[in-house]
Each structure stands twice: as structure tokens, then as C-alpha cells.
Amino acid sequence: MIKHLFLLLLLTFTTTASSVENIHSFTAGSMNKILSAREGRPFILVFWNLDCQYCPTELKMLNKLKQQYRKELDVVLVSTDTLDDVPQLASRVKSYGIRKIEQWVFASSMPEQLRFEIDKRWYGEVPRTHFYNPAHERIVKTGLVEKKFVEQWLADNKPESKLH
């Protein structure tokens, strides 16, 4: 019995630790890293936090779409919480069923500077979702994004549509 309990605890700790390791520190310059890694490709950048009322709904919806449109849909999550919140963030995201989505968390004592680097007109309200086309022109939505909008954006930004 103790052996089984130990194995269960070890498995739980390992799963949580590996989830935590997949969350990157978002610092000055991180936005450019995210953009550079996706040069010429469309993607969705979602800013959220643990206290956000609408974020669970949006994140679950995006996760379902990610499963449906595996290759066409690239989603990056950035939490505006702090590094101290990483274990909670990993647990929360996992509870939404999210497994293979790139994740970041604000890692600055001055989050205002990070927000300014991302968007000079953003004051921290979440959810805030940026839809980048292949040329990295963006559409910004604040508040809950409807599934219909995301599906239309996907249709407009399929990799095949770049071949004209």
C-alpha cells in the first residue's frame, strides 16, 4: 500500500514538474522571440490570468479548436500572473485539458513595461487575444472571443491561402 502511494505521489510530482518546466519566463524581448519563431505563419497570442472570469471559457474553446485544427492553429498563452504562480498556472491549464500549447508567464517586477512592449494601448485587461496573420498584422480582441470569430480567422489565414 505504501509503495503504491509513493508511486502515485512520484507520478503526480513528475507530471506537475514537467508542466511547470514548459512555462517560459516572459521578459523584455520575449515578444520578439515569439514573433520570430513564427515568421510567416499565423498564430493566436492569448493573454490571461488566474483571476480572469472569462479566461477559462476562452482557453477551453481554443483547446478544442486546437485539437480539431492541429496543424493550422498555433496558440501561445501568456499569463499576466507572476513566476510565483507557475505551479497554479500549470495546474489550471492542465485542468482545462490543455497539453501542447506554448506557455509563458510575466517575469518582471514591472509588468507595465512588458505590456507596453506588447501593445502601447494595453493596460492589462484580460482576456486579451491577438490574432496574427502570416504577415504578423494583428487583430486585437479584449474580452471573450467567440468561436465563430476564431473559425473565420482560421479560414482567412490557412497556409494554402498564402500561395497566390
Describe the function of each predicted region:
Residues 59-96, 111-114:
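Structural microenvironment flanking redox-active thiols in thiol-disulfide oxidoreductases
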Residues 49-53, 80-84, 108-111, 137:
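Solvent-exposed loop/turn segments at secondary-structure junctions
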Residues 4-13:
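Sec-dependent N-terminal signal peptides
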Residues 93-126:
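Short, internal strand/loop/helix patches
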Residues 38-43, 71-74, 99-101:
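Loop/turn elements at helix/coil->beta-strand transitions in domains of secreted/extracellular proteins
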Residues 15-36:
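N-terminal "domain-start" segment that seeds a small globular fold
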Residues 37-53:
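Short active-site neighborhood of thiol/selenol oxidoreductases, capturing the structured segment around
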Residues 126-164:
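Thiol-/selenol-based redox modules, centered on thioredoxin-like
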